[in-house]
């Protein structure tokens, strides 16, 4: 099967500039890369075709050979071999393209080396999360070795790796393609230590429990994260440290349930309070408040107390407190109380009962209608 013209593969004119070639290759790579098309053999083949075309056209010598002789320039060894030092750095190109797509960065020497990020879960009571708090925490981490100041060397001297010349990576040739990998001689550090530090044994870092004070802002909720820049693991060979991410988890509360910036709770009331109406006191996170219960209140009725919820950590507005009334059946009744209830119940007869208990009457009518339909 004959190969397609390289310019046609990338969709550019024969006089395309280097920048136009690079943009065309990026478009192709983003569309057909195997990571974005798992299991798609056709997409993978197109991606390889684009990669080969760009490898040739982005190299001045190879491009001139291709323009003069086409694909035959490489089939018969014309126009030079694989990409030398002047060829494109495919690792850098892929780092530019897919570092942004998948959240990573370039793996080449341009990538900034730093310490690893550290995660910590901080459990708080609801009151602490709502009001804000300063909490001391202790985390196991890697810190910079003090005797060698993170260099890993006992005398502070390090040598540039002769294999990678301090880049930390070496270039590997695979036919016309060039790849980069971590230098096996210096393990990607770019330097060598002849006299390792006796404290850290050349690592430049030591394990230690770090104690930190964290200021938790008012209004945080489960899942919120607090970033402490530079409080993660120390970087290798004196490079910058990572960050510490503190994830908040709020414990369940005995009274309140939280929904964003709003709070919910249940308020039990007696039958007499529900029937006759009353004013009841309820707890809020800021103290006590009053709810006026109107006469004939039923279980499930919601009362809204504006501004008695949680102050938002983002907008600083305050949520509301929703109180759901639950009519409580009395227990442990005395003989006199039982007698009074019997006398009260005796007043509910005939149409009088339907008038005083409309929901019960509706339910009974519904059940009767159901059985009538079943037996008809």
Swiss-Prot record:
It comes from the Bacteria. A zinc finger (CR-type) spans 132-209. Keywords: Chaperone, Cytoplasm, DNA replication, Metal-binding, Repeat, Stress response, Zinc, Zinc-finger. CXXCXGXG motif repeats lie at residues 145-152, 161-168, 183-190, 197-204. The keyword Zinc applies. Zn(2+) 2 binds at residues 161, 164, 183, 186. HAMAP family: DnaJ (MF_01152). This is Chaperone protein DnaJ.
């Amino acid at each position: 099967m004959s190969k397609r013209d390289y310019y046609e593969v990338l969709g550019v004119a024969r006089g395309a500039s280097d920048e136009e070639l690079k943009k065309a290759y990026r478009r192709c790579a983003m569309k057909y890369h195997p990571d974005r098309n798992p299991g798609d053999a056709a997409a993978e083949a197109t991606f390889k075709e684009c990669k080969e075309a760009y490898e040739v056209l982005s190299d001045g010598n190879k491009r001139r050979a291709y323009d003069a002789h086409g694909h035959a320039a490489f089939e018969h060894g014309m126009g030079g071999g694989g990409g030398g030092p002047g060829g494109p750095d495919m690792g850098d190109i892929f780092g530019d393209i897919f570092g942004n797509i998948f959240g990573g960065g370039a793996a080449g020497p341009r990538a900034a080396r730093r310490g690893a990020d550290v995660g910590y879960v901080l459990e708080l009571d609801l009151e602490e999360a709502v009001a804000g708090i300063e909490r001391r925490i202790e985390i196991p981490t890697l810190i910079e070795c003090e005797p060698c100041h993170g260099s890993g060397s006992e005398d502070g001297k390090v040598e540039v790796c002769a294999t990678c010349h301090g880049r930390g990576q070496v270039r590997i040739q695979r036919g016309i393609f060039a790849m980069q990998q971590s230098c096996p001689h210096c393990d990607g550090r770019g330097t060598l230590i002849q006299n390792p530090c006796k404290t850290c044994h050349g690592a430049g870092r030591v394990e230690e429990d770090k104690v930190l004070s964290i200021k938790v802002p008012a209004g945080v909720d489960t899942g919120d994260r607090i970033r402490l820049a530079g409080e993660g693991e120390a970087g290798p060979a004196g490079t910058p440290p990572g960050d510490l991410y503190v994830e908040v988890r709020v414990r369940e509360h005995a009274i309140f349930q939280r929904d964003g910036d709003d709070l919910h709770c249940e308020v039990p009331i007696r039958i007499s309070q529900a029937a006759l109406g009353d004013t009841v006191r309820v707890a809020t996170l800021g103290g006590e408040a009053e709810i006026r219960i109107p006469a004939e209140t039923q279980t499930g009725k919601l009362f809204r107390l504006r501004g008695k919820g949680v102050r938002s950590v983002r907008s600083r507005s305050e949520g509301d407190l929703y109180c759901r009334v639950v009519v409580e059946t009395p227990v442990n009744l005395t003989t006199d109380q039982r007698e009074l209830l019997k006398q009260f119940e005796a007043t509910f007869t005939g149409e009088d009962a339907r008038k005083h208990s409309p929901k019960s009457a509706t339910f009974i009518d519904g059940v009767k209608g159901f059985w009538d339909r079943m037996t008809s």
